[in-house]
Amino acid sequence: VTHDWNSQAGVRYDHTSVVGVIFSPRVNASIDLIPNLLSLQGGYGIAAKMPSLLYLYPENAYFEYININELTNENIPESQRLFMTTTEVRQVDNSDLKIAQNHKAEVGFNLRVGKTNLNVIAYKERLKDGYVMSQTFNTFNTFIYNEYQRTENGIELSSSLPVLSTYAKPTNNLNIETKGLEFDLNIGRIDAIRTAFQINGSWMRTKSWRQGYSFYDNSEDAASARKPVAIYSQEGNASYKQQFVTTLRATHNIPRIGFVVTMTAQAIWQQSNWNTFGNDSIPVGYLALEDASVNMFPKGKYTTTQQVKDAGYGYMLNNVSHNNAIKESYSPYFCFNLNVTKEISNMLRVSFFANNMFRSYPRRESKRNPGSYIQLNNRFFFGLELSLTL
């Protein structure tokens, strides 16, 4: 018995302004364990995800500070009222941006018995250095906010106080892990009823999280009320999504009148989402108001919110909600689609389609917010397609 072995390997080269150069390798292999019956396949590769223009060429950040505003002061003649502002412009730096990489490994098998063909693939993906707009230590800057007022001696400086200005910049802080299983079962055409059946489905679970730190500013707008900005760790914070979907497709031929009718039944057996949280209620440090310097607390110094309050940092506490830790899941629901194609000639074909043809919109009560309901399924829509082959 001959066992055929096939393999492919390659590498892709990409060069993009700002983010530079990257090589993306890929290897695939398959072997026929039982010729014309059973084969195994696998692969591993790294795909480069290039940043969009938003991340390559971000716009500058602009801040407008009102130094004096007399527009609504009726005690001053309208022609003498002053309105003066200072505009601060920060260049958004993305020189440290890297090319995101998606690592994917997969393994599966293909089984052929007569007209029936079954293909099953298990895979795992990991997106590293994904793009996201985030605040970092470098996006906070101290600005001296000068305010003026009118006195008997004219316009005088009334206060000169530091404020922290911030913006979001392109970062590589996003990470996504996906694992799943896909299958495709093609039963083939049953000649007695002129109908072909195909079943496919997938189970998928996705985890996404961000690196770096998050920041909480509990200050009011007035310059005199500005406070240091709290630093929070994002370690342990993650969001999850999971679903299991199958699709049954039946294609029926009516040769006498040139009709092809395709009915698709999609079943969403399981769909859920939830979040996990780390230490998102205790700050790990703060940014000083005077110079935006980073001041980290000794590790483990504060373990309770009361300890933070007793140390005089109560204003840094962020009222967080862990409502999303409750797993939101929905019982099975279904969607049916129809496609009818008429072959008028060898050159012309007309198709009518209707998605969610029964207008099924199941409602499920939210587990996080009892009493509120979520409407599921795609919206109903239909249309006509005309295909002309020349």
Q: What are these language model-derived features?
A:
Residues 1, 13, 21-23, 101-105, ...:
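Residues that define the transmembrane beta-barrel architecture of outer-membrane proteins
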Residues 1-3, 27-31, 107-113, 122, ...:
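Residues on the lipid-exposed face of transmembrane beta-strands in outer-membrane beta-barrel proteins
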Residues 1-30, 350:
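Surface-exposed extracellular loop regions of Gram-negative outer-membrane beta-barrel proteins
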Residues 4, 124-126, 143-278:
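Gram-negative outer-membrane beta-barrel transporters
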Residues 4-7, 36-40, 115-118, 191-197, ...:
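Repeated loop/turn-to-beta-strand initiation elements of outer-membrane beta-barrel proteins
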Residues 11-17, 31, 35, 44-50, ...:
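Transmembrane beta-strands of outer-membrane beta-barrel pores
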Residues 47-127, 147-154, 161-190, 239-244:
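Outer-membrane beta-barrel signature, preferentially recognizing the C-terminal barrel domain
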Residues 48-49, 127, 267-319, 330-333, ...:
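C-terminal beta-signal and adjacent terminal beta-strands/loops
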